From Swiss-Prot:
Enzyme class at the top of the EC tree: transferase
GO molecular function, one term: arginyl-tRNA--protein transferase activity
InterPro entries found in the cross-reference section: Acyl_CoA_acyltransferase, Asp_Glu_LeuTrfase, N-end_Aminoacyl_Trfase, N-end_Aminoacyl_Trfase_C, N-end_Aminoacyl_Trfase_N
Protein name: Aspartate/glutamate leucyltransferase
Reaction catalysis annotation: N-terminal L-glutamyl-[protein] + L-leucyl-tRNA(Leu) = N-terminal L-leucyl-L-glutamyl-[protein] + tRNA(Leu) + H(+); N-terminal L-aspartyl-[protein] + L-leucyl-tRNA(Leu) = N-terminal L-leucyl-L-aspartyl-[protein] + tRNA(Leu) + H(+)
Keyword set, alphabetical order: Acyltransferase, Cytoplasm, Transferase
Family: Belongs to the R-transferase family. Bpt subfamily.
Location(s) in or outside the cell: Cytoplasm
Amino acid sequence: MRHTLPLAPQFYVTAPQPCPYIDGRMERKLFTALQGEFAETLNDSLSKQGFRRSQNVLYRPSCADCTACLSARIDVSAFTPSRSQRRTLKRNAVMEREATSPWATEDQYSLFRKYLDARHAEGGMADMDIFEFAAMIEETPVRSRVVEYRQSAEAAPNRKRAPRNLAGVCLTDVLDDGLSMVYSFYDPDLVRQSLGTFMVLDHVEIAREAGLPYVYLGYWVPGSPKMGYKASFSGLEIYKNGEWQPIGDPESHSRDTHPLNVDPIAEQVAKINLPDTLPTDRRKG
């Protein structure tokens, strides 16, 4: 099914499929292609409205009877690490960061497979081969970086580990107002390092150094064990009812179904604000 606006681009909706976050529910996504010379402008604009990027597609949950998935971002100016997060930073003080072009490597894929097998063996990415992994990393029409984290030789907890062994990876988009952590994975053997939390903390620092106000974390789902850690970051905002707002008490947000609060697809599309820099002929399309 296709839904169009008087302004380009065009938006589509996926067929319902089982929700990966809440058992017994069905998910549906609203999406549009991300391509051409205005891809970055569109990515910047729609990211502010709760969309996420996957390769050359921007998508947002548009479920028929559920509004549980909420886009989340950290307001860098309002962030202060907790005691637990300060300990995580201290434990990873010798971790070395390197930002590279979005180019997939065998080391990355090996770590990716190890991470999936340990943490998400039944997930939608479980069967991803190296070519699909390369597409996930490399097929980006916007400004993206691969941020790698490696342990220094002195920090390796096991003498048998190779120096500077790859410990974590994050595919990151650079937006006009922040960093978007598109996908991250890490060595599941390094449990004590809390690498998932550390990479978020490090991206907050990168954003602060770059003068960018936000770090986009993807979706937060109330009560979801997979998503609960995101609510532990101070300065967290969620995109709800068409605007960004402080998360407040995480327990106050319900994941009950709300069929009467879900606008029809055509109305959802009509409410999307498109960037003003699209060329006139496309906007009239």
